[in-house]
């Protein structure tokens, strides 16, 4: 896939944006397991949570009314949380009010769909459009389309067939996931691919209709992420000013390839003689099990390689301090087995840091190889170590790549830009949908 396909898609969406200008929509965002209120890096909390939260924020800033429906996973959660101006988070009672792994949520989807449908019927004005996130949310959106005639678009965030090819028997989702995804691609009014590879996988593995797939990437918020002077960031985090620091940030699950980064940093130290430290940010501290097991495995990997003293596992961190972590690093590394998009490389670019990323999924579209960083094969720690060593030897190259990445992120990957593209897609879908009454602001 050519790097400029994302930019070309963005230009098309920008041309459509005039259709959305001035039209206030009532938008229902379905995100069954990924609440916008969850702490990034906690169990089952990653890019989809950020996507839903930032999309809702920017749509509301543009004047739209947004309800986000997510499963109630704690008894103290209020049914309706007035989160920000014109954004409500609706906690849906479906299954027990506690954490349930998303792989085990399929039996609760019918209850989720029934509740959302009843809630929608009780509203003083109908929703204009539904935006589903993940395949189980798509099932809810399809129920709303059948029951209430609401058009829906869907962002899958990950595809079952791609996951199964990458993980094999380690994939614990029910096998009917793939059948459901194929049916949703036929039923959706528009399918949102996050990168050219995502669209290619939909067409090749599912037979999705090309004409109904729109490429819209993920993004970052300039209000949240910007370059901080490295000495200042390191001082706040208690980091040595003189060391070469590699950052990895994300969920602690095997497919993220954190072990490859640990192995690469070990090679960087032992083979290239670089005084390198690895920061691993993310991971749940709530005792839900999966993240804890992976964290223990990763600690063991570091110990076996003799670099345990040079790897710091910070656990999950508030988003307000992430710019310090990005800015404190010399380079950001991300080597997943597969990645539908990959928000963290874009966030690192926004903080003017070079990225060494696996040549998979969205990363091979966002990282301009040789310009904003380097692309390497996934599960290849030697290739990773080679690129890290090159950046260590040539700090001026690292600085130039970071600056180029910052420009690229600001030009193509802000959440405001993403939301404008999606609002244009909504408008395009609604060209053939029923007329709607003027929207009224939600009561506080």
Regions found by a protein language model. Give the residues of each.
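N-terminal subdomain of nucleotide-sugar transferases
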Residues: 2-89, 442-444
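Carbohydrate-associated surface elements
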Residues: 197, 219
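A short helix/loop element that forms part of the nucleotide-sugar donor recognition site in Leloir-type
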Residues: 226-239, 245
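Nucleotide-activated donor-binding/catalytic signature segment of Leloir-type glycosyltransferases, i.e.
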Residues: 291-316
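Short alpha-helical donor nucleotide-sugar binding micro-motif in glycosyltransferases
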Residues: 324-329
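Aromatic "clamp/platform" in nucleotide-sugar-dependent glycosyltransferases that forms part
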Residues: 337
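Short hydrophobic beta-strand element within catalytic cores of glycosyltransferases
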Residues: 354-357, 367
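Conserved acidic donor-binding segment of nucleotide-sugar-dependent glycosyltransferases
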Residues: 369-370, 374-381, 390-395
């Amino acid at each position: 896939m050519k790097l400029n396909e994302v930019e070309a898609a963005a230009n098309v969406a920008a041309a459509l944006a005039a259709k959305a200008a001035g039209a206030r929509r009532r938008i229902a965002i379905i995100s069954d397991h990924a609440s916008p209120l969850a702490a990034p890096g906690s169990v089952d909390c990653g890019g989809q949570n950020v996507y839903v939260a930032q999309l809702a924020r920017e749509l509301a800033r543009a004047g739209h009314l947004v309800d986000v429906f997510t499963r109630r996973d704690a008894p103290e959660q209020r049914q309706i949380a007035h989160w920000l101006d014109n954004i409500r988070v609706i906690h849906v009672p479906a299954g027990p009010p506690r954490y349930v792994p998303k792989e085990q949520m399929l039996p609760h989807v019918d209850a989720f769909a029934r509740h959302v449908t009843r809630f929608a019927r009780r509203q003083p004005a109908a929703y204009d459009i539904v935006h589903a996130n993940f395949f189980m949310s798509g099932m809810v959106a399809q129920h709303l389309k059948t029951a209430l005639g609401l058009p829906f678009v869907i962002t899958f965030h990950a595809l079952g067939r791609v996951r199964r090819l990458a993980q094999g028997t380690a994939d614990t989702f029910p096998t009917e996931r793939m059948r459901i995804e194929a049916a949703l691609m036929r039923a959706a009014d528009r399918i949102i691919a996050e990168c050219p590879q995502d669209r290619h996988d939909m067409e090749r593995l599912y037979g999705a209709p090309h004409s109904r797939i729109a490429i819209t990437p993920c993004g970052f918020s300039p209000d949240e992420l910007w370059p901080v002077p490295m000495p200042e960031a390191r001082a706040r985090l208690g980091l040595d000013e003189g060391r070469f620091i590699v950052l990895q940030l994300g969920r602690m699950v095997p497919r993220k390839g954190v072990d490859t980064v640990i192995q690469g940093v070990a090679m960087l130290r032992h083979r290239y003689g670089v005084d390198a430290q690895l920061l691993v940010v993310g991971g749940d501290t709530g005792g839900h099990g999966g993240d804890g097991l992976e964290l223990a495995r990763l600690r063991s990997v570091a110990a076996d390689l003799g670099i345990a003293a040079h790897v710091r596992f910070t656990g999950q961190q508030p988003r307000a301090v992430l710019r310090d972590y990005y800015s404190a690093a010399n380079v950001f590394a991300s080597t997943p087995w597969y990645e539908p998009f990959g928000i963290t490389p874009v966030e690192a670019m926004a903080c003017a840091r070079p990225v060494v990323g696996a040549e998979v999924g969205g990363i091979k579209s966002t990282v301009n190889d040789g310009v904003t960083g380097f692309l390497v094969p996934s599960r290849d720690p030697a290739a990773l170590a080679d690129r890290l060593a090159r950046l260590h030897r040539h700090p001026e190259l690292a600085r130039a790549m970071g600056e180029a990445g910052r420009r690229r992120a600001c030009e193509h990957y802000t959440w405001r830009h993403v939301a404008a593209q999606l609002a244009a897609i909504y408008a395009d879908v609604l060209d053939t949908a029923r007329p709607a009454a003027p929207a009224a602001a939600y009561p506080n």
